[in-house]
């Protein structure tokens, strides 16, 4: 594991074993943040297992637990004390230990794990609470919570009240130990669409509370292990089904390679199931004798979990952008996370007022998901760093009539105006994105939003970062823009009208536009009194008038005499 490495000024640069970045904290702060997160997880853990109440979403808890382990590894700290398993309240020994399951991160890891292993089967990874069922002489005699894998709580009285769990067995199952998952029964649950629903916490809550016997009717059981059971998997599944554990037989499939595992995984993700799942488990039919089972040592099975629909991401910086209308937007830069195969490294928070209400600072952990069209969305702040160092937002004097001309304070809104005028809604300058505009402005120091019209082909070619092909394309685009109709140039100047309203107005020259009264603008489509007033203010703005004269001097259609 990698240790924090001090630099001369006491700031630490960082990497973790997994390739994820570690926080650039001094040692004292690192120790404090780790201790705070560790205590918070312990508190949530305690509430969850003692009261059956979830103070935080299951997925958030799991991801923050993983984040804690990452931080601990960054500083070379022992991770064995991480509170990711229930506190040991029960003292009932498991006749066979719960091994837990190793997590595989992707298909490549699945292929590697399967290599050299035979007689493999795949099952859905049912999301619930693990339990041991002990049958003696054909009767259910004990039910034990997973606990720490070696011992847990005696849940027998509660388990006897769950109708879906057989109370009697016969044949080979008359004297048997079974391990499985108590889950919340669902009708037609489609995991991809409906998500996890905090199912694990709901099941734990039902089993912990004393006043909800009727709620136990909604619980089911999925048996995933029969220690020392039949070596032949089909025989094992058949006997379980005959005993009343039919789901195991229905949802256990033989697989030969990672492709078949992936097919089953995708099918169960998108199909209607009777339970919530969070991935699949691949297991060998051949298992060691039960006396050799130990927590954390089940190398004959592994899990390939579904990617979470929302990811906990660390805020690395807070940035402000000013749109062409002067609206200030706050953006959180993130340590990159993957959501639905999309690399997410920034999320729009919204207005300064909304950012202040969220109280987000660098170092905070936020929950991010994808909204419509794959746009990252801020869902909640799940953990706040102790240090609340926030940048100061820019002055709020910007509006829809500022920054047509460049200045030190107008940098961001000026760039936003360039991006707008190059869009298809205005002049349609193909290939001109934010990076290109910034490069041109930084190199040639535009005076106003149309200064690029005077650039020569040599000047464009000498712009840093512009290859020959790109320079020639931009030169052609700039020259073609001169032929664009008057209405396109007016849109580029951000007249507060829709394209439909501007077309309906019939104006084809600046002179015509100057003659229009406010009453004329009010009668146009989607243009009421307020917008008509804004058009008059725009037309009378000194910067707009200056730009119209400049465009006339450039012989742009509609601006000359």
From Swiss-Prot:
EC number: 6.5.1.2
GO biological process: DNA repair; DNA replication
GO MF term list: DNA ligase (NAD+) activity
Enzyme class: ligase
Top-level lineage group: Bacteria
Record field: catalytic activity: NAD(+) + (deoxyribonucleotide)n-3'-hydroxyl + 5'-phospho-(deoxyribonucleotide)m = (deoxyribonucleotide)n+m + AMP + beta-nicotinamide D-nucleotide
SUPFAM superfamilies given in the database record: DNA ligase/mRNA capping enzyme, catalytic domain, Nucleic acid-binding proteins, RuvA domain 2-like
InterPro entries attached to this UniProt entry: DNA_ligase_AS, DNA_ligase_B, DNA_ligase_CS, DNAligase_adenylation, DNAligase_N, NA-bd_OB-fold, NAD_dep_DNA_ligaseB, NAD_DNA_ligase_OB
Active site: 125
Species for this entry: Salmonella typhimurium (strain LT2 / SGSC1412 / ATCC 700720)
Pfam families: DNA_ligase_aden, DNA_ligase_OB
TM annotation in the entry: none
Gene name as annotated: ligB
PANTHER family reported in the protein's UniProt record: DNA LIGASE, DNA LIGASE B
Annotated keywords: DNA damage, DNA repair, DNA replication, Ligase, NAD
Gene3D superfamilies: 5' to 3' exonuclease, C-terminal subdomain, DNA ligase/mRNA capping enzyme, Helix hairpin bin, Nucleic acid-binding proteins
Family: Belongs to the NAD-dependent DNA ligase family. LigB subfamily.
Cited function: Catalyzes the formation of phosphodiester linkages between 5'-phosphoryl and 3'-hydroxyl groups in double-stranded DNA using NAD as a coenzyme and as the energy source for the reaction.
Protein name, as recorded: DNA ligase B
């Amino acid at each position: 594991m990698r240790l924090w490495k001090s630099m001369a000024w006491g700031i630490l640069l960082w990497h973790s074993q997994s390739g994820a970045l570690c926080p650039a904290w001094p040692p004292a702060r690192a120790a404090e943040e780790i201790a705070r997160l560790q205590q918070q997880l312990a508190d949530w853990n305690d509430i969850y297992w003692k009261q059956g109440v979830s103070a935080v979403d299951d997925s958030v808890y799991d991801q923050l637990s993983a984040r804690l382990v990452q931080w601990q590894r960054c500083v070379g700290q022992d991770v064995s004390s991480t509170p990711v398993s229930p506190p040991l309240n029960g003292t009932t020994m498991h006749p066979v230990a719960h091994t837990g399951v190793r997590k595989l991160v992707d298909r490549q890891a699945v292929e590697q794990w399967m290599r050299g292993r035979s007689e493999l089967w795949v099952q859905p990874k049912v999301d619930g609470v693990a339990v041991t069922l002990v049958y003696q002489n054909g009767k259910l005699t004990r039910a034990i919570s997973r606990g720490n894998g070696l011992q847990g709580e005696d849940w027998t009285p509660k388990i006897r009240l769950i109708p879906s769990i057989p109370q009697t067995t016969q044949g080979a199952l008359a004297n048997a130990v079974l391990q499985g998952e108590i889950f919340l029964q669902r009708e037609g649950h489609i995991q991809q669409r409906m998500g996890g629903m905090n199912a694990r916490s709901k099941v734990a809550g039902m089993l912990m509370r004393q006043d909800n016997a009727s709620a136990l009717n909604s619980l089911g059981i999925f048996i995933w292990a029969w220690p020392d059971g039949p070596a032949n998997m089909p025989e094992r599944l058949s006997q379980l089904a005959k005993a009343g554990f039919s789901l195991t037989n229905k949802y256990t499939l033989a697989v030969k390679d990672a492709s078949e595992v992936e097919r089953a995984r995708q099918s169960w993700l998108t199909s209607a199931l009777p339970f919530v799942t969070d991935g699949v488990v691949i297991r060998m039919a051949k298992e060691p004798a039960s006396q050799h089972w130990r927590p954390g040592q089940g190398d004959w099975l592994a899990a390939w979990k579904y990617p979470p629909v929302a990811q906990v991401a660390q805020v690395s910086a807070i940035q402000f952008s000013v749109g062409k209308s002067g609206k200030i937007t706050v953006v959180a830069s993130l340590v990159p996370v993957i959501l639905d195969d999309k690399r997410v490294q920034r999320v729009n928070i919204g207005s300064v007022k909304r950012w202040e209400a969220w109280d987000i600072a660098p170092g905070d952990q936020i929950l991010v998901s994808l909204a419509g069209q794959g746009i990252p969305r801020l869902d909640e702040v799940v953990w706040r760093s102790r240090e609340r160092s926030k940048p100061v937002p820019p002055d709020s004097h910007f509006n829809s009539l500022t920054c047509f001309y460049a200045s030190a304070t107008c940098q961001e809104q000026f760039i936003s105006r360039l991006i707008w005028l190059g869009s298809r809604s205005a002049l349609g300058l193909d290939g001109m994105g934010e990076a290109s505009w910034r490069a041109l402005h930084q190199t040639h120091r535009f005076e106003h939003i149309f200064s690029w019209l005077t650039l020569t082909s040599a000047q464009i070619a000498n712009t840093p970062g512009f290859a020959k092909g790109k320079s020639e394309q931009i030169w052609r685009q700039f020259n073609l823009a001169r032929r664009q109709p008057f209405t396109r140039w007016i849109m580029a100047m951000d007249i507060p009208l829709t394209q439909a309203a501007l077309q309906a107005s019939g104006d084809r020259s600046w002179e015509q536009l100057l003659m229009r009264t406010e009453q004329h603008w009010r009668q146009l489509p989607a243009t009421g009194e307020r917008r008509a007033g804004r058009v008059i203010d725009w037309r009378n703005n000194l910067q707009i008038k200056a730009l119209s004269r400049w465009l006339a001097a450039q012989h742009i259609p509609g601006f000359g005499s």
